[in-house]
A protein has these predicted regions:
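Histidine-centered divalent metal-coordination motifs
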Residues: 67
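Aromatic-glycine hotspot motif
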Residues: 1-61, 73-142
């Protein structure tokens, strides 16, 4: 499955910005490639920049990393439910509510990178387990 194979009826308009930014890899190669690039990028960041925030109501770099982890976990769970044929409307989540309780700024860069890597590898394993028919299942989520 590639981003270019998606029809606009298969996702909410909100996600089009993100889908358009995705390179047109097949899913497995895209997940692995972005894992490698993201880890290289995160490892290159100086520690003194990880708690940088450009405005008082914005997230730090650590909080952004934690958001990536949390969002991938939520979306992988949704994908599993859709692949299994779940037709229930899945609840949304408020990433802005998650951020303060994530305590991301108390974590080390290594801890965040480790969790990101583990979550991405888990997502890759999950998507590897899906057949093509499972990958094209459509579900509802707020």
């Amino acid at each position: 499955m590639k981003a270019s194979e998606l029809s606009k009826e298969e996702f909410k308009p909100y996600f089009l910005t993100y889908i358009n930014k995705a390179l047109d890899f097949d899913l497995k190669n895209g997940l692995q490639s972005s894992l490698n690039h993201t880890i290289s990028f995160l490892e290159s960041l100086p520690d003194d920049k990880l708690e940088y925030v450009y405005a008082s109501d914005k997230w730090t770099v650590k909080e952004i990393i934690q958001h990536l982890i949390d969002a991938e976990r939520v979306f992988a769970y949704r994908a599993m439910r859709f692949a299994r044929g779940d037709k229930n409307n899945l609840p949304g989540y408020d990433e802005n509510q998650y951020t303060p309780s994530s305590i991301a700024n108390r974590r080390s860069k290594e801890s965040l990178i480790n969790e990101y890597t583990n979550q991405r590898q888990s997502s890759i394993s999950l998507f590897d387990s899906f057949t093509n028919d499972m990958l094209i299942q459509i579900g509802l989520a707020d």
